[in-house]
Amino acid sequence: MKIAQINTVCGNGSVGRITVDIYHALKKSGHDGKIYYGRRTAPDSVTTEKIGSNLDMGIHVLSTFFTGTHGFNSHAQTKQLIESLKAYDPDLIHMHNIHGFYLDVEELFAYLKTCGKPVVWTLHDCWSFTGHCAYFDYVACDKWKTGCEKCPQFRNSYPYALFKDGSKVNYARKKAAFQGVKGLTIVTPSKWLGDLVKESYLQEYPVKVIPNGIDLDKFVPQKTKKRDKHLILGVANVWDRRKGLEYFKELHGMLDPEKYEIAVVGVNKKQIKELPQGMIGIEHTQNVEELMELYSQASVFANPTLEDNFPTTNLEALACGTPVVTFATGGSVESIDETCGRIVPQKDVKALYKAVTELCENVEQMRGACRERALLYNKYNRFGEYLDLYEESIHHYNNL
């Protein structure tokens, strides 16, 4: 098989790493692959092609910022991608994030409707079926089910627009572009997101759930020095409003400082200065060993997220033997059961406090069950599911 993958980035961030991992799984199984990406740099070990330049991306950002439209610029860059796809001639095209200021989605989908190739599209958020937002739980909006307009967060949620709410036009254009692709299969990492797709204008397509996985040879329980206090850990790539940093601050004020301490990883310098006294802030780290040590030292991993698909941080904590407590948000609940964590109502800090303190008292009895739960999410099994899906899709398409 020859598989072309398309994503905003390659080797960076969770989705960028997934594309690279799938590429290596293909090569290991004797297949061929190529990754097309729009931003940053890519690992030397991967066959790639960058679409456009930083200047092109900047123009797209400004267009979104001033006109409220997103995904309808970058015409020349999209033509470059299409010509390269024609030359590479893959057996299947696998798209991940097609937002991110690097593609004209109308032009890309016009090609997909005529190229004679099966398509797999993995959705990592909700952008594909809304007029603006990547997530809408925070504002409890369901306009995407019938038609977006008067977006309540076009100014303060990605992709940011300053002057104009383009959600009504964006919704109509995306709906027209994304419907009617022969042989397209949608993949979601969570059942939660898959169920949303079935309520959206993408409901014509089959949906397969393939959860994110992690490297269980890398994330393993570590022997660490016993701490004087129970450590409650939080980890995020970016601590924006939906990740729940404010709830950690509230929780900190409720916990006995003689028995508990909180550490949050991924905060910036400004956020560190704003943390309450005694709360530990650690800047973003890509060091797996450092993360493993923190996960293993923690008595509880807390994830008070307000919008999420299927966070791999939950899996990383479980793999290191640490129970997880999460708000009942999106797909964050799907990796947790009573043997390895707790699920509490959104924004309920009293329930969060109760769950955290209860788990701290029972953590040593739960560590084995946490690791067992993580074994369900071995990333190599997940990539095997993708390779099986590729073969099924190609076979099915050739027999349509």
Q: At which residue positions do the language-model features occur?
A:
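Nucleotide-activated donor-binding/catalytic signature segment of Leloir-type glycosyltransferases, i.e.
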Residues: 266-289
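Short alpha-helical donor nucleotide-sugar binding micro-motif in glycosyltransferases
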Residues: 293-298, 386
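Aromatic "clamp/platform" in nucleotide-sugar-dependent glycosyltransferases that forms part
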Residues: 306
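Short hydrophobic beta-strand element within catalytic cores of glycosyltransferases
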Residues: 323-326
